[in-house]
């Protein structure tokens, strides 16, 4: 019996030690109540076989330890669970991104509407500016027409007040009026071309495009000279006096224009920087212009002297013939005006015949114009010519 008891003790004793880890959750009731040898009475005198059988029947089976490590490692062993966990972690992120996209859609729509409104406002301002410019141009044309009407009314009133037809002023040639209208249009077109030149320079236009703009500006000046030539054929005194210009411009006029040498002298500082060849060409052009101006001035002086001599020589003959003619019957009230009319008619006839000699001067001017050198800007680069335009 003594040998059987230790064997039973060896069988039942390890249970408390094995359950020591889980003593907080699973208390070993059998070990705490019955001691080291549970279910065995010390005063028992039964046989060893019966005690062993009773111990084996009554003794509880050993508790198995739960494998928490395997349970904790279980999610790491399954790929589907990892994917599910990643999906659970990413689902809030996708939800937030979709919410931000939904929230950004109204902002994008507002920005597009604001951009459309700004573009519409810009186009409206451009249309308003063009409309105002058209109104200003129309106003200037209307003012010019009003001036023409006022001038025509004054001339008609002066004609109506005159009593003697011989003292009437010469009628205004339609070519002169046409030149004044064309000159006003030419000035307006010149302003537009100047603005176009500046815009091309600021936009850094290419060579061919800029050259076309410069050539158009030069052709515009050629049209002015052609209009002057036609007006001079109608009324040379109108063109020579330059009544269509301002008082300051008329002070510097020379034969219905400005001296080319003076124009070159004013433009020369603006042509810098130039190469040595360009500077020599400009200087030679200025000297040639001065020689032609001197020749033309001498021709004008000779013409004036010829006209003065002709008028003085013919004045004696005219006055003698006018005095020798039988005087008209003296009217009662218009005697002074009739005598003045007779003298004025004689002198105006002689003046008209003398002014016929201006054809020589016209031929001389045409000769100079055909022999003129190219403009001073022809020696420069097209961009510098545009800057001077």
Curated annotation (Swiss-Prot):
Residues 107-151 form the bZIP domain. One of its GO terms (biological process) is defense response. It is found in: Nucleus. Residues 80-110, 320-345, 370-389 are annotated as: Disordered. Its main location: nucleus. SMART domains: BRLZ. Residues 380-389 have a biased composition (Basic residues). One of its GO terms (molecular function) is sequence-specific DNA binding. Residues 176-389 form the DOG1 domain. Residues 91-110 have a biased composition (Basic and acidic residues). Residues 109-129 are annotated as: Basic motif. Pfam families: bZIP_1, DOG1. Residues 135-149 are annotated as: Leucine-zipper. The keyword Secreted does not apply. Keywords: DNA-binding, Nucleus, Plant defense, Transcription, Transcription regulation. It comes from the Eukaryota. GO terms for cellular component: nucleus. The keyword Oxidoreductase does not apply. Belongs to the bZIP family. PANTHER family: TRANSCRIPTION FACTOR TGA9 (PTHR45693), TRANSCRIPTION FACTOR TGAL10 (PTHR45693:SF31). Transcriptional regulator involved in defense response. This is Transcription factor TGAL10. It comes from Oryza sativa subsp. japonica. The gene is TGAL10.
């Amino acid at each position: 019996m003594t040998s059987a008891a230790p064997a039973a003790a060896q069988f039942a004793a390890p249970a408390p030690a094995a359950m020591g880890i889980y003593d907080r959750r699973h208390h070993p009731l059998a070990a705490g109540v019955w001691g080291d040898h549970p279910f065995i009475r010390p005063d028992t005198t039964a046989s060893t076989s019966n005690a062993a059988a009773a111990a084996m029947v009554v003794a509880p089976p050993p508790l198995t330890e739960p494998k928490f490590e395997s349970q904790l490692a279980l999610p790491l062993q399954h790929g589907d669970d990892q994917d599910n966990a990643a999906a659970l972690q990413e689902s809030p992120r996708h939800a937030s991104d979709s919410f931000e996209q939904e929230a950004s859609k109204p902002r994008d729509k507002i920005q597009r509407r604001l951009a459309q409104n700004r573009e519409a406002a810009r186009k409206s301002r451009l249309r308003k500016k063009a409309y105002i410019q058209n109104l200003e141009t129309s106003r200037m044309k209307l003012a010019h027409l009003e001036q023409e009407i006022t001038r025509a009314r004054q001339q008609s009133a002066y004609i109506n007040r005159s009593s003697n037809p011989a003292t009437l002023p010469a009628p205004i040639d339609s070519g002169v009026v046409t030149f004044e209208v064309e000159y006003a249009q030419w000035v307006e077109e010149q302003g537009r071309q100047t603005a176009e030149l500046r815009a091309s320079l600021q936009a850094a236009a290419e060579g061919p495009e800029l050259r076309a703009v410069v050539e158009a500006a030069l052709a515009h000046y050629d049209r002015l000279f052609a209009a002057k030539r036609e007006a001079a054929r109608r009324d040379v005194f109108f063109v020579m006096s330059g009544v269509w210009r301002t008082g300051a411009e008329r002070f510097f006029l020379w034969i219905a224009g400005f001296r080319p040498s003076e124009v070159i002298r004013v433009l020369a500082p603006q042509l810098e920087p130039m190469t040595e060849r360009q500077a020599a060409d400009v200087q030679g052009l200025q000297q040639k212009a001065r020689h032609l101006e001197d020749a033309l001035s001498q021709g004008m002086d000779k013409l004036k002297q010829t006209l003065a001599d002709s008028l003085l020589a013919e004045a004696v003959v005219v006055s003698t013939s006018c005095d020798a003619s039988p005087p008209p019957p003296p009217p009662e009230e218009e005697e002074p005006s009739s005598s003045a009319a007779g003298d004025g008619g004689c002198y105006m006839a002689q003046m008209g015949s003398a002014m016929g000699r201006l054809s020589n001067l016209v031929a001389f001017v045409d000769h100079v114009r055909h022999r003129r050198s190219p403009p001073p800007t022809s020696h420069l680069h097209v961009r510098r010519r545009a800057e001077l335009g």
